[in-house]
């Protein structure tokens, strides 16, 4: 248990991975049964089968499912916009990832770029089923896929979800010269040009 009363991820999962994201064909392994990637990964049947993936969560409105019979598909029809209600899907997607894992399968969660929507859903899953706080879940996913950057609206929904699960939040929204961002972005935002999706 951490000092916040949450368990931490198992030590075997906490060790840095020596496999680069490029070696995984554009996907990152988040846990033994959860992968995160961009949309093009979902079209690579050989890669999916090689990783033991049995379920594909498609968190886009713009990419159709391939509907190959050997995979189960879950569609989360959302745009990568701050007002999109991704929080409505946190429990459903987390429960599905957990169910697939218990059946010894693996899940790929993808969006178009593997940066915002899919990362948000993976973070929510870690909070719910690995009992880690939002900050730990974000740092864990970012260590596995450094390009992740959930949009501000998704952060607000993750903060609300953490409060619902644990009664407090470990990430706060703060004012910066570029607008309101989660405090985990504050340091890096000092070096960024303005970007609408911060």
From Swiss-Prot:
InterPro entries in the cross-refs: Atypical_DUSP_subfamB (IPR020420), Dual-sp_phosphatase_cat-dom (IPR000340), Dual_spec_Phospatases (IPR052103), Prot-tyrosine_phosphatase-like (IPR029021), Tyr_Pase_AS (IPR016130), Tyr_Pase_dom (IPR000387), TYR_PHOSPHATASE_DUAL_dom (IPR020422)
Catalytic activity entry: O-phospho-L-tyrosyl-[protein] + H2O = L-tyrosyl-[protein] + phosphate; O-phospho-L-seryl-[protein] + H2O = L-seryl-[protein] + phosphate; O-phospho-L-threonyl-[protein] + H2O = L-threonyl-[protein] + phosphate
GO molecular function, one term: MAP kinase tyrosine/serine/threonine phosphatase activity
Active-site residue numbers: 111
Domain of life of the native organism: Eukaryota
Domain Tyrosine-protein phosphatase residues, every copy: 26-167
Role description: Involved in the inactivation of MAP kinases. Dephosphorylates ERK, JNK and p38 MAP-kinases. Plays a negative role in TCR signaling by dephosphorylating MAP3K7 adapter TAB1 leading to its inactivation.
Subunit structure: Interacts with CD28.
Protein name per its UniProtKB record: Dual specificity protein phosphatase 14
Organism per entry: Bos taurus (Bovine)
Underlying gene: DUSP14
């Amino acid at each position: 248990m951490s000092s916040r009363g949450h368990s931490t991820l198992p030590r075997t999962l906490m060790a840095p991975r020596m496999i680069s994201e490029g070696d995984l064909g554009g996907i990152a392994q988040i846990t033994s049964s959860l992968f995160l990637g961009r949309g093009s990964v979902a079209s690579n049947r050989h890669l999916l089968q090689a990783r033991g993936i049995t379920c594909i969560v498609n968190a886009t409105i713009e990419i159709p499912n391939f509907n190959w019979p050997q995979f189960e598909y879950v569609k989360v029809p959302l745009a990568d916009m701050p007002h999109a209600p991704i929080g409505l899907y946190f429990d459903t997607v987390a429960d599905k990832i957990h169910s697939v894992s218990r059946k010894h399968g693996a899940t790929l969660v993808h969006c178009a770029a593997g940066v915002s929507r899919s990362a948000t859903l993976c973070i929510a899953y870690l909070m719910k089923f690995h009992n880690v706080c939002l900050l730990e879940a974000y740092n864990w996913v970012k260590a596995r896929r450094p390009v992740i950057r959930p949009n501000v609206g998704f952060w607000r929904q993750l903060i609300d979800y953490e409060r619902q699960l644990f009664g407090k939040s470990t990430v706060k929204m703060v004012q910066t010269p570029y607008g309101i961002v989660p405090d985990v972005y504050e340091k890096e935002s000092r070096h960024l040009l303005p970007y609408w999706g911060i």
